[in-house]
């Protein structure tokens, strides 16, 4: 397991994904943000929605804005819909992915299926 430069707990599971920042050779750099996973339908991909405040000069107030980012979801982290995750910027992994999920900060409560 490598040290990636962030103060987060490494995942308990081990994977052999070469694009994993913990077990592969993917380096992270630049920004890192928190967000909520809104979709996990893609293969090893999640869509993370983050909220931020934008200042409106005319009204001298802030408004809440949202943006969606595609991020790589390694097998050892395995984030699901509703999870609060920390994503970090990295090199372009594909046409739309240049972020990777580094840690799950809070798991979503899921209903038990019977």
From Swiss-Prot:
Coiled coil: none annotated. PROSITE patterns: RIBOSOMAL_S17 (PS00056). Pfam families: Ribosomal_S17. GO terms for cellular component: cytosolic small ribosomal subunit. One of its GO terms (molecular function) is rRNA binding. GO terms for biological process: translation. The keyword Transit peptide does not apply. InterPro entries: NA-bd_OB-fold, Ribosomal_uS17, Ribosomal_uS17_arc/euk, Ribosomal_uS17_archaeal, Ribosomal_uS17_CS. It comes from the Archaea. Keywords: Ribonucleoprotein, Ribosomal protein, RNA-binding, rRNA-binding. Part of the 30S ribosomal subunit. One of the primary rRNA binding proteins, it binds specifically to the 5'-end of 16S ribosomal RNA. NCBIfam families: PRK08572.1, uS17_arch. Belongs to the universal ribosomal protein uS17 family. This is Small ribosomal subunit protein uS17.
